[in-house]
Design a protein with these regions (language model features):
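C-terminal scaffold of the Radical SAM
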Residues: 65, 89-93, 105-132, 160-163
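Accessory C-terminal segments flanking Radical SAM cores
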Residues: 135-171
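Solvent-exposed, flexible loop/coil residues
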Residues: 14, 103, 155
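Gly/Ser/Thr-rich beta-alpha loop segments that engage phosphate groups in nucleotides
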Residues: 34, 105, 157
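Radical SAM/AdoMet-radical enzyme domain recognition
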Residues: 1-98
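Flexible glycine/acidic-rich beta-alpha junction loops that bind and position SAM and/or redox cofactors
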Residues: 72-74, 93-114, 137-150
Length: 171
């Protein structure tokens, strides 16, 4: 089971239980540098993700990343430096989701432009090619639909828990 999480509840007792179960992988939400990440996810979130990565790596638990890219963080979260940091922490795969302005704090100005979406398609294809020496396999939730038979949401293979605790078929 792949569980997408902000990682704030991952601690040692939790990791021990996950190891005992043996069938859970995690996708950790991260959106760039400490300041960029915490501005969107809340103070201390970046440090919580870094700590969770250390624990998951220590316990040998499979994990990747869930990265929301915006018009403001797109180049930072696809930079060689960022990708290498993720690999050093133990993540070698992840999903990129482009920002969708939904909810009470929607910010349409954070939506990637068409040119930025094209950059993502090209950058992800490059990172997956043999030209790249970064051992990280990125997937683009929206732009890789052809490889997974279309959107995986909508009652097929995905649902999320919203901030009110309700299960929904899509974001």
């Amino acid at each position: 089971f792949a569980i997408y999480t902000n990682s704030t509840l991952i601690d040692e007792p939790f990791c021990k239980e996950v190891v005992r179960l043996g069938n859970i992988a995690f996708m950790l939400s991260i959106e760039g540098s400490p300041s960029t990440n915490d501005a969107r996810r809340g103070d201390g979130h970046y440090d919580a993700v870094m700590h969770a990565m250390d624990l998951l790596k220590e316990y040998g638990i499979l994990f990747g990343t869930s990265i929301c890219y915006t018009s403001a963080n797109l180049e930072a979260v696809t930079s060689d430096h960022f990708m290498r940091m993720l690999c050093e922490k133990g993540a070698h795969f992840g999903f990129y989701f482009h920002y969708m302005p939904v909810g009470n704090d929607a910010a349409p100005e954070l939506m990637p432009s068409p040119a930025q979406r094209k950059y993502m398609i090209d950058r992800i294809r490059y990172l997956r090619s043999e030209k790249s020496d970064i051992p990280f396999y990125p997937m683009d939730f929206q732009n890789d639909g052809e490889f997974v038979g279309g959107c995986i949401a909508g009652g097929r293979n995905y649902f999320h828990i919203n901030s009110a605790g309700d299960a929904e078929p899509c974001v």
